[in-house]
Amino acid sequence: MAVPARHTSKQKKRSRRAHLKLSVPAMHYDATTGEYRLSHRVSPKGYYKGRQVVSENSASDND
């Protein structure tokens, strides 16, 4: 069974984990609906790239 040769210091441990931070999701302003939404996703009102791709009735039926 492997045993560490030396104690891992806090600095070594934290610098190794530095790339594991969370990133802020990319939000974009949708000019059609006037709301912010995640990029490459349909808005809550069913619009994508300025066109309505999902009707609002079918979007609310999934609740």
Curated annotation (Swiss-Prot):
GO terms for cellular component: large ribosomal subunit. The keyword Ribonucleoprotein applies. The keyword RNA-binding does not apply. One of its GO terms (biological process) is translation. One of its GO terms (molecular function) is structural constituent of ribosome. Keywords: Ribonucleoprotein, Ribosomal protein. It holds the Pfam family Ribosomal_L32p. Belongs to the bacterial ribosomal protein bL32 family. This is Large ribosomal subunit protein bL32. It comes from Lactobacillus delbrueckii subsp. bulgaricus (strain ATCC 11842 / DSM 20081 / BCRC 10696 / JCM 1002 / NBRC 13953 / NCIMB 11778 / NCTC 12712 / WDCM 00102 / Lb 14). The gene is rpmF.
